């Protein structure tokens, strides 16, 4: 479902490899290999987004939504990794600034679309670029339509924040 949600954005290069098979353990190591290969193949890449949904209440009904116009939209949360876990990550502040820029524009255009940014001690492969983040689109209880609706608004926010 993350691939379907991601396809709703205007993405030039997308890697839809499942890295949590055969187990979630080691998925970030496997995805780092893909990211590095993708960056070599696409050296002009400026933004790296690791698209997730919030797993809080796995299998539960937690569904953070906001109503924008006539649409019920899954809320979006950035997760920013740091070097707090001991791994080198000199770009985390730049990644945080990028997320803040997007969230501020989102709050201006569509109040409630974004949840507060979560900053964590793990680096989540975000050391690969100056605009590398995890974006959690909704949670386990959100419907696919709510998540797809978020992408429509997120695309507009990113266009306004980054291209104007």
Mark where each language-model region is.
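Active-site-proximal beta-strand/loop segments in catalytic clefts of secreted hydrolases
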Residues: 15-18, 50-54, 80-83, 118-121, ...
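Second-shell loop/turn segments in exported
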Residues: 1, 17-29, 35-38, 64, ...
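Extracytoplasmic/secreted envelope proteins and their assembly/folding machinery
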Residues: 29-36, 96-103, 132, 148-151, ...
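Active-site-adjacent mobile loop/cap segments within catalytic or ligand-binding domains
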Residues: 114-164
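Sec-exported extracytoplasmic/periplasmic mature domains
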Residues: 8, 40-44, 53, 57, ...
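Active-site microenvironments of hydrolase-like enzyme catalytic domains
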Residues: 34, 38-83
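Active-site-adjacent substrate-binding region
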Residues: 91-118
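Single conserved hydrophobic/aromatic residue that forms the stacking wall/gate
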Residues: 1-6, 10-11
């Amino acid at each position: 479902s993350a691939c379907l949600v991601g396809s709703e954005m205007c993405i030039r290069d997308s890697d839809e490899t499942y890295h949590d098979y055969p187990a979630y353990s080691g998925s970030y190591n496997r995805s780092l290999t893909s990211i590095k290969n993708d960056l070599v193949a696409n050296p002009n890449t400026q933004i790296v987004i690791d698209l997730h949904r919030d797993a809080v209440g796995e299998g539960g009904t937690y569904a953070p939504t906001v109503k924008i116009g006539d649409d019920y939209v899954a809320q979006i949360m950035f997760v920013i990794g740091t070097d707090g876990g001991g791994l080198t990550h000199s770009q985390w502040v730049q990644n945080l600034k990028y997320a803040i820029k997007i969230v501020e524009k989102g709050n201006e255009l569509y109040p409630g679309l974004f949840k507060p940014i979560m900053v964590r001690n793990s680096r989540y492969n975000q050391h690969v670029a100056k605009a590398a983040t995890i974006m959690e689109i909704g949670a386990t209880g959100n419907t696919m339509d709510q998540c797809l609706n978020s992408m429509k608004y997120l695309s507009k926010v990113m266009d306004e924040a980054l291209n104007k």
